[in-house]
Amino acid sequence: MSYFMESERIKLRPVQKDDLKKLAELMSDREIGVLSGEVYPITEREMDNFYDRCQKTDDRIWFVIIDKETNSIIGETGFLRIFMPWRTADYSLMIWNRNYWAKGYGKETANLMLEYGFNSLNFHRIAIGVVGNNERGLRFWKSIGFKEEGKQKDGFFNNGEYSDFIMMYLLDEKYRVTRNNNKT
């Protein structure tokens, strides 16, 4: 099987129909789902509908994240709401397997995807949204260079509680400066 992108420890390839059951299984962890800003649990049928939408439109690109050593799916990542006239997209990244948390797999994935987004797809702007009480997620995105641009007050509701939704962005020129500084 060919892979779209790879780095030292991970491979990225487009989501395939055969991946949906495993993704639904990984996404069944309610605590992780809340951190991701989605309403969970996700059923296999909902995953199937998402997959079909990905196949029918050109406004989203979705990949599974695979650990090279075990050849197992550990998460998913992709661009959505791609709008090429403005060269913008929203970005999503989720390491669903807790065994891979805080070990650099998220950063490795983000680096591959940002390089792809800015250098291959020629995006000018990539945006993300982070649930406000996900302090670890906010620190992660800031460490990669994303900046806060606004807050949707009580923009996320889960388990009877509202949380703010923090909007963040990264522009191509900031990405290039950050990457060049890291190479020296």
Describe the role of every protein-language-model region.
Residues M1-K21, D29, W62, E69-T184:
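Acyl-donor (CoA/ACP) binding surface of acyl/acetyltransferases
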Residues L26:
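Conserved catalytic core of Hanks-type protein kinase domains
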Residues D52-V64:
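A short helix-loop-beta-strand connector motif used in the catalytic cores of GNAT acetyltransferases and
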Residues E31-Y51:
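Conserved GNAT-fold acetyl-CoA-binding loop/helix
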Residues I42-E46, C54-K56, M94-W96:
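Juxtamembrane/interface motifs at transmembrane-helix termini
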Residues D29-I32, K56:
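Short helix-loop boundary/capping segments at the starts of domains
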